[in-house]
């Protein structure tokens, strides 16, 4: 019965990393917006100055996060999936997960 326990621990670790990554990206977008007046067009626009080079924008399943920018470039949503395959959404607000 050790294997299910390890799977559960691995899933929790992936979910914790996803939560941390979303918070980091939210903060980077906020800093970008403060410097430029709008949100970045793509997450790649954050690399080097706001996010370390080589950062992968992936969710807990290894799939690329989906970044959607509003028409006025002032708001965004960032979506991915947790280790259980449930959608997690961040929009930079204090209640980032739905």
Regions flagged by a language model, labelled:
Residues 18, 22-29:
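N-terminal membrane-insertion helices
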Residues 27-84, 97-98:
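Extracellular/periplasmic head regions of type IV pilus-like filament subunits
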Residues 1-20:
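Amphipathic alpha-helical segments typified by the pilin-like N-terminal helix
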């Amino acid at each position: 019965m050790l294997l299910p326990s390890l799977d559960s621990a691995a899933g929790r670790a992936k979910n914790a990393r996803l939560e941390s990554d979303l918070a980091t990206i939210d903060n980077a977008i906020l800093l970008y917006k403060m410097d430029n007046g709008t949100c970045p067009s793509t997450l790649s626009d954050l690399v080097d100055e706001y996010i370390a080079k080589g950062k992968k924008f992936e969710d807990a399943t290894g799939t690329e996060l989906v970044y959607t920018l509003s028409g006025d470039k002032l708001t965004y949503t960032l979506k991915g999936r947790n280790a259980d395959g449930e959608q997690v959404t961040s929009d930079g607000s204090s209640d980032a997960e739905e």
